[in-house]
């Protein structure tokens, strides 16, 4: 499967390029960067330190998409919306690991999925997506009258969105377990005199610092006991492997919007 990496010069872009080389059935056929990037014109393999691959980084995505089977995208919300439209024009797979998308962004991506096969997830790791299933089941079994749900996440100092896409993914899983809407029941900020905790609320706490790739814990706190479900990312390659697995799974599927739960056969 011929894959294009967008944001090829970034941390995740370089990780994707390296990881593609080790996965059977996947081949790098294109690399995209923004206009003005210092990486333009350079070989994608040389930028990542793995030697020449014969793939030059360009800022003109559509001709590259037209010759590919799929796109791997961990960029920004605005860029991902643009790439989704181009993937729809090219009728190819678009794997989106970008976080921080607004409701309007998601609607545009959903529209693009009429013609592109899109897999979008707040986290591409296999472990986190299994964790989301466990969180949903725990939230369903341990009801709001007895257990409060708090989601704690920590990432490196450079992360620009909060809560993380993974924290929101886990919050959505907890909300599904409780049969409530996360948007109406989440608490993102606590400061000053807040009063007692509202029954059924799902709280979020965000930490930023150092080089932490991603730590997430879902705490179900009852009277006299706590259940903690956690995931700790130790290497960005877990996200790259998950994204490539998603692309290979989506290749040949009909257009539509899918998630990693679909890829893993965990969507209930």
UniProtKB/Swiss-Prot annotation:
**Pathway as given in its UniProt record:** Amino-acid biosynthesis; L-lysine biosynthesis via DAP pathway; (S)-tetrahydrodipicolinate from L-aspartate: step 4/4
The UniProt entry, under PROSITE patterns, shows: DAPB (PS01298)
Q: Which residues form the active site?
A: 155 (proton donor/acceptor), 159 (proton donor)
Q: Which positions does UniProt annotate for (S)-2,3,4,5-tetrahydrodipicolinate binding?
A: 156, 165-166
Give the GO biological process terms: diaminopimelate biosynthetic process; lysine biosynthetic process via diaminopimelate
Q: What does this protein do?
A: Catalyzes the conversion of 4-hydroxy-tetrahydrodipicolinate (HTPA) to tetrahydrodipicolinate.
Q: What is the lineage of its organism?
A: Bacteria, Pseudomonadati, Pseudomonadota, Alphaproteobacteria, Hyphomicrobiales
Kindly list the positions annotated as binding NAD(+). Answer: 7-12, 33, 97-99, 121-124
In Swiss-Prot or TrEMBL terms, this protein is called: 4-hydroxy-tetrahydrodipicolinate reductase
Enzyme Commission code:
1.17.1.8
Family, per entry: Belongs to the DapB family.
**Entry keyword annotation includes NAD:** yes
Per UniProt, NADP(+) binds at 34
Q: What class of enzyme is it?
A: oxidoreductase
Catalyzes what? Answer: (S)-2,3,4,5-tetrahydrodipicolinate + NAD(+) + H2O = (2S,4S)-4-hydroxy-2,3,4,5-tetrahydrodipicolinate + NADH + H(+); (S)-2,3,4,5-tetrahydrodipicolinate + NADP(+) + H2O = (2S,4S)-4-hydroxy-2,3,4,5-tetrahydrodipicolinate + NADPH + H(+)
Q: Which UniProt keywords apply?
A: Amino-acid biosynthesis, Cytoplasm, Diaminopimelate biosynthesis, Lysine biosynthesis, NAD, NADP, Oxidoreductase
Q: Which organism is it from?
A: Brucella abortus (strain 2308)
Q: Where in the cell is it found?
A: Cytoplasm
Which InterPro entries does its entry note?
Answer: DapB_C, DapB_N, DapB_N_CS, DHDPR_bac, NAD(P)-bd_dom_sf
């Amino acid at each position: 499967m011929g894959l294009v990496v967008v944001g090829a010069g970034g941390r995740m872009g370089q990780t994707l390029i390296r990881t593609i080389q080790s996965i059977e059935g996947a081949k790098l056929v294109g690399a995209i960067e923004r206009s003005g990037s210092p990486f333009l014109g350079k070989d994608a393999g040389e930028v990542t330190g793995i030697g020449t691959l014969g793939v030059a980084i360009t800022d003109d995505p559509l001709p590259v998409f037209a010759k590919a089977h799929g796109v791997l995208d961990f960029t920004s919300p605005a860029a991902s919306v643009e790439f989704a439209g181009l993937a729809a024009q090219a009728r190819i797979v678009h794997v989106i690991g970008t976080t921080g998308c607004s409701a309007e962004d998601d609607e545009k991506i959903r529209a693009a999925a009429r013609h592109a096969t899109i897999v979008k997830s707040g986290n591409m790791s296999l472990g986190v997506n299994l964790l989301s299933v466990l969180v949903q089941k725990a939230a369903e079994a341990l009801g709001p009258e007895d257990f409060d749900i708090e989601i704690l996440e920590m990432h490196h100092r450079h992360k620009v969105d909060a809560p993380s896409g993974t924290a929101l993914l886990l919050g959505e899983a907890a909300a599904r377990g409780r049969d409530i809407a996360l948007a109406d029941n989440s608490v993102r900020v606590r400061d000053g005199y807040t009063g007692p905790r509202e029954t059924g609320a799902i709280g979020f706490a965000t930490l930023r610092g150092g080089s932490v790739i991603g730590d997430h814990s879902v705490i179900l706190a009852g009277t006299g006991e706590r259940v903690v479900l956690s995931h700790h990312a130790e290497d960005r390659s877990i996200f790259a492997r998950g994204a490539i697995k998603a692309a290979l799974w989506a290749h040949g599927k009909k257009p539509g919007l899918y998630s990693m739960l679909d890829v893993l056969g965990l969507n209930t």
